[in-house]
Amino acid sequence: VTFVPPGVLDAARALASGEALRALGLVGRVESALGLTLRGIAYAQLGDLEQARAALEQAVGITRDPRTRARARAALVEIALSTGEPAPAARAAKASASDLERLGDARNAAMQRLVLARAEVLLGRLSEARRVVDEVLAADLAPDLRAVASLAQAEIAVRSVSASAARAALARARSCLAEVPNQLLARALVALEQELSRPIARTLRKGIIRDVDLFAVEEVSRGEVLLVDACRRLAIGGRVTIPLAKRSVLFALLFELARGWPGSVARDELAARAFDVRKVNASHRSRLRVEIGRLRKVMDGLAAEPVATADGYVLESKRDVVVLLPPTDDEAARISILLGDGATWSAQGLAEHAGVSKSTAQRALAALVRSGGAVRTGKGKDVRYTRPGTPIASRMLLLGLVPKP
């Protein structure tokens, strides 16, 4: 039986309950592989990823114990993910989970699969992330690990605009944490609960604008109304979704008609806004007729269409018409809400969906990265942006790191 100093055992228990500062105080000077691994995890939980990486790499270099080495490498995988390298981190997480499983460490293998799920979220593959988390939850898990997985479920649901599913997952996580209190997970739980309740957008309905939370966005996205989504530039009615991000003129026409609903919009006013001109002439009016015809064709299946009136056009719809707007009118707010879907975006893609120029999108993204509202990954043509979100693998708890005394 390997002797483990009491201080190291206490540090492992402190990390297991989310007390990183206490753990760091206990192993800050311990130079064994196990001590260095615990120190690295403590640094990571506190956000000092450089010191965390250094300690963990040192542990990998000096240990002869396969399980300690595998656990230190597992922690390094999550550091790679935290520093914006989701694609290589996903590959490393799969390999790490297999290694831990082979060494009989099913608990930390499950944690690595949750790291993999986090990587899939950052890569924009929400369905794959959901599948991985569901597989983890299908096993017989301890309450603390089940709490981590339930938090993962909640974040994926938030990014999928499924507020009800997110609330149910958070309730399961809270129930687990009632059995095994953990400061780190409790903070993640509160952060996600706050995200569910805060206003994230606005709705415009019959001239009335209201701030709405994720539950309200979920409600209007179910297809019971005709939703004209100015955040993602699409229209939803019934089971039909029409993407219009790359058809800016058609979306501009639909947006203006939806904004004026149930009234009509004058021809010259509609043309000026859709074509972004100050003075409308005969050629603009002719083009307007053509574009309205195209819009009518695109809207087939939505139970709504633009119809000519004496002085303009009106949107006739069998459902109430609701416009979904960003929380504010600035470009950063529009781009931020697009990032919330979990996908990784190029600046060009965000510009197209937000209806702004690429340079405007780049300025807004730079401001979001500086403020922590966005994460930038890749280089050159491969630069992508996503929302940071809650670390769904819980920043390397790696519970059960040392043998029981």
Regions found by a protein language model. Name each.
Residues N281, L288-V323, A366-D382:
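DNA-binding patch around the recognition helix
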Residues V240-F275, L295, E331-I335, D341:
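Short amphipathic alpha-helical recognition elements used for nucleic-acid or partner binding
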Residues A186-F251, F255, K297, L302-E331:
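Short boundary/linker motifs that mark transitions into or out of structured domains
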Residues V314-D329, K379-L401:
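Short, cationic-aromatic polyanion-contact patches
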Residues P5, L34, I41, R71, ...:
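Residue register of alpha-helical TPR repeats
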Residues L24, E31, E57-G61, K94-D105, ...:
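Amphipathic alpha-helical segments of tetratricopeptide repeats
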